[in-house]
């Protein structure tokens, strides 16, 4: 059993407000909500950070970002812009060591 909170969310061991899911990623609302709609996009394959991605995983994960961003925007007509952010490594302030991309309206 893993102690990774994102693995537990992916495996439906703990609840989350899911925005999007397919065979490659799970996107869900960040529990801290920097702004309304703050969403995390998490690869289902456990990789600690961007340095562990291979080309196929990177292509598959990042190809889904626009679709998920449009869904976040469609959920709230007040959203006029969106930041895409990923902290990679402890020195970059990564706090959960399962790669994830923040979509912050």
Regions found by a protein language model. Name each.
Residues 1-105:
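HIT superfamily nucleotide-processing domains
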């Amino acid at each position: 059993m893993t102690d990774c909170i994102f693995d537990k969310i992916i495996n439906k061991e703990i609840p989350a407000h899911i925005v999007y899911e397919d065979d490659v990623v799970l996107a869900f609302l960040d529990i801290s909500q920097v702004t309304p709609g703050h969403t995390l996009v998490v690869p289902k394959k456990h990789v600690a950070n961007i340095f562990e991605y291979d080309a196929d995983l990177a292509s598959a994960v990042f190809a889904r970002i626009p679709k998920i961003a449009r869904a976040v925007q469609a959920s709230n007509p007040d959203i006029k812009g969106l930041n895409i952010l990923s902290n990679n490594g402890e020195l970059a302030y990564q706090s959960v060591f399962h790669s994830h991309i923040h979509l912050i309206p």
